[in-house]
Design a protein with these regions (language model features):
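Short, contiguous acidic/charged loop-to-helix segments that flank catalytic cores in large enzymes
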Residues: 51-54, 209-210, 225-233
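Active-site acidic catalytic loop and adjacent metal/ATP-binding pocket
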Residues: 31-38, 171-217, 229
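ATP-binding glycine-rich phosphate-binding loop
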Residues: 20-35
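Helix-rich C-terminal or lid/interface subdomains of diverse kinases
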Residues: 110-113, 137-172, 177-182, 248-272
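ATP-binding pocket architecture of kinase catalytic cores
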Residues: 35-139, 145, 151-156, 179-180
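Juxta-kinase regulatory segment immediately upstream of eukaryotic protein kinase catalytic domains
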Residues: 1-20
Length: 272
């Protein structure tokens, strides 16, 4: 509550005399929160609260500028010391909501192809030494969430010795396959909850943890999304479409689709 009052005071200083209604919009898994600031005429902007002692705004601004070739929120105001940003409001309709509202395969295919076009645009700008490396340590850390968080904490059933041996053997087999993939910019959470339904192309959110890593990662995140499921034939068709688009754009995907899809499936094991 103290942070919210601090935020309201800051907004009043930035927009003196304006009657602004502030409503909660969303929160990330970390300390970052978002509010929707609404003016009497109906205009709105999104306000980010990112406490500088925990997370700050630097990573968000850096990746936002790197991904500016696609539809990311325009930044209007920033207070680095307090951890506040006022940015463009891309609306309330996520891809997930749109896909759940209209379940026709034709609609899903159209929206997902638009998302894949956006992904290819992001990847076309890839270059090394710009974003953190998605290396073995980071991949291993993500994989460790399954035994350490999901099994032990969420389910209350930590792996026994034999199960842990099997898990470790699986990880040992998986990591080389993932690390062998060519690298591009990776959004790292390119899922339907982080894409907004906006005219022409999806708005892209929650990109601040982007890295430089495996080329199939974001396509897998989108097409193997944990919050929505499609028939295997549908996913295969879209994976082919992505591979074709990536090849046409000169991205470092395998020349043979079979090789790409094998890498895609390996990445799916790590991702979900």
């Amino acid at each position: 509550m103290q942070r919210q009052e601090q935020l309201k005071k800051w907004l009043a200083q930035q927009y003196p005399g304006d009657e602004i209604q502030l409503e909660f919009a969303a929160a990330d898994a970390d300390f970052r929160r978002y509010f929707r600031a609404i003016w009497p005429d109906g205009a709105s902007r999104i306000v980010m609260d990112a406490p500088p002692e925990h997370i700050g705004t630097d990573a968000y601004i850096k990746v936002r500028d790197i991904f500016s070739m696609v539809k990311v929120p325009e930044i209007y105001l920033r207070d680095r010391e307090q951890g506040f940003i006022v940015m463009e409001d891309l609306g309330k309709v996520t891809y997930l909501a749109a896909l759940q509202h209209d379940e026709r395969a034709l609609v899903h295919r159209h929206l997902l192809l638009e998302a894949l076009d956006t992904l290819v645009e992001i990847q076309k700008g890839s270059q090394p030494d710009v974003l953190p490396e998605y290396d073995e340590a980071l991949l291993s850390r993500e994989l460790s969430l399954f035994p350490e968080w999901f099994c032990a904490k969420e389910l209350g059933k930590p792996l026994n010795f034999k199960q842990r041996q099997l898990w470790d053997a699986g990880v040992k087999a998986l990591l080389p396959a993932l690390l062998a993939q060519s690298k591009v910019f990776v959004h790292r959470d390119f899922i339907v909850r982080n894409l907004m339904l906006t005219p022409g192309a999806p708005g892209v959110l929650d990109f601040q943890d982007a890295v430089y890593g495996p080329v199939s990662y974001d396509a897998v995140s989108l097409l193997r999304d944990a919050f929505i499921e499609w028939e295997e034939e549908f996913v295969l068709d879209l994976a082919i479409r992505y591979w074709e688009k990536a090849r046409a754009a000169g991205l470092p995907v395998p020349e043979a689709f079979d090789d790409f899809y094998r890498a895609f499936e390996w990445m799916g094991v790590q991702r979900h």
